[in-house]
A protein has these predicted regions:
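Glycine-rich beta-alpha loop elements in corrinoid/cobalamin-binding modules
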Residues: 86-224
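Radical SAM [4Fe-4S] cluster-binding motif and immediate context
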Residues: 240-282
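Short boundary motifs at domain starts and secondary-structure transition points
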Residues: 34-45, 102-104, 146-147, 203-204, ...
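Conserved alpha-helical elements of sugar-nucleotide-dependent glycosyltransferases
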Residues: 61-69
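Short helix-loop-beta junction
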Residues: 68-80
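Short N-terminal or domain-adjacent regulatory/targeting segments
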Residues: 1-44, 93-98
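A short, charged/proline- and glycine-enriched loop
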Residues: 42-49, 107-110, 151, 253-257
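Core AdoMet radical
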Residues: 50-59, 80-89, 110-122, 136, ...
Length: 282
């Protein structure tokens, strides 16, 4: 635990790119000290959000989406957001699944948010849940409690890997965001401030909110009499959002580099590619 006062650690950025081969295999304890821009907050009285790209630290920290979400959640004074990454072989070795910033167990968070970019990471989602001791299926979590009587974390997902087709992972998540999340996250935080005591009420409200797919409340079968289409979210004005690096680390594909999004999507329109569905200048 940190001191009662909020501690925000922003190290002086060393912007020189590290020479030589990047380290793909650093574990959580090795990677954290090398970071610049880490945000560490006291846990007292805050909404605790775990943020995960279900892949290695090296891959996850190469993602601007993860960095944008990290900054957006932590921008709220009554919210803390800490990162959790998948580590090859960690589950099989019986290692506990802990957050990077405060070494907190995944099950201790109020919300566990996943940003998923690739279909192959679906398998890592299930492995992470099992490693954390959390029932993988949403129905199992709804029907049970943790050993101390607390509810399980609310599990949500977003990203292109689920926007294209959420159904492969629908049984594992309480709610899935379809589309772009910049404008959806602040509203989600507002709902969590008032609704975490009763997850059923919170999920019902999300089900009525554009962009959110709550699998157990919305049949996926188009022939079902209660089928309702999910409205996909698009950011109305990308320049309103600073999609650039928040964290710097030598242990990523773009070692200690500042990244900026200058456009989103692709205008070529190849039918086999999901990137064709959006082209927006930043």
């Amino acid at each position: 635990m940190q001191s009662s006062a909020e501690r925000i650690v922003v190290k002086q950025a060393g912007m020189k790119r590290r020479a030589g081969k990047h380290n793909h295999t650093r574990n959580r304890q090795q990677a954290a000290p090398a970071e610049t821009g880490t945000i560490v907050k006291d846990w007292g009285g805050r909404l605790a959000v775990a943020l995960t790209m279900p892949n290695s630290y090296y891959v996850g920290m190469s993602s601007l989406a993860l960095q944008l979400l990290y900054r957006t959640f932590n921008a709220e004074s009554d919210v803390l957001c800490e990162r959790i990454f998948w580590e090859k072989g960690a589950a099989q070795a019986g290692k506990p699944l802990l957050s990077l910033e405060n070494d907190m167990a995944a099950a201790d968070f109020d919300v566990w948010a996943f940003t998923i970019s690739w279909e192959m990471d679906y398998f890592n989602v299930v492995e992470l849940l099992r490693q954390a001791g959390i029932p993988p299926l949403a129905a199992e979590r709804a029907a049970s409690r943790q050993w101390d009587g607390r509810p399980w974390p609310l599990l949500i997902a977003g990203g292109p890997g689920v926007t294209m087709n959420p159904e492969p992972v629908a049984p594992f998540f309480d709610a899935i965001l379809i589309g772009e999340g910049e404008e959806a996250v602040p509203h989600f935080i507002d709902l969590c401030r008032d609704g975490l005591e009763d997850p059923a009420v919170l999920l019902a409200e999300l089900d009525r909110t554009p962009g959110w797919y709550v699998p157990h409340l919305r049949p996926s079968n188009r022939t079902h009499p209660h089928f309702r289409k999910v409205e996909r979210l698009w950011v109305r004005s990308l320049p309103d959002f600073d999609t650039s690096s928040t964290l710097y680390t030598p242990d990523t594909e773009f070692a200690n580099m500042h990244l900026m999004e200058i456009a989103r999507g692709c205008g070529r329109g190849c039918r086999c590619c999901a990137a064709r569905i959006s082209l927006t200048a930043c």
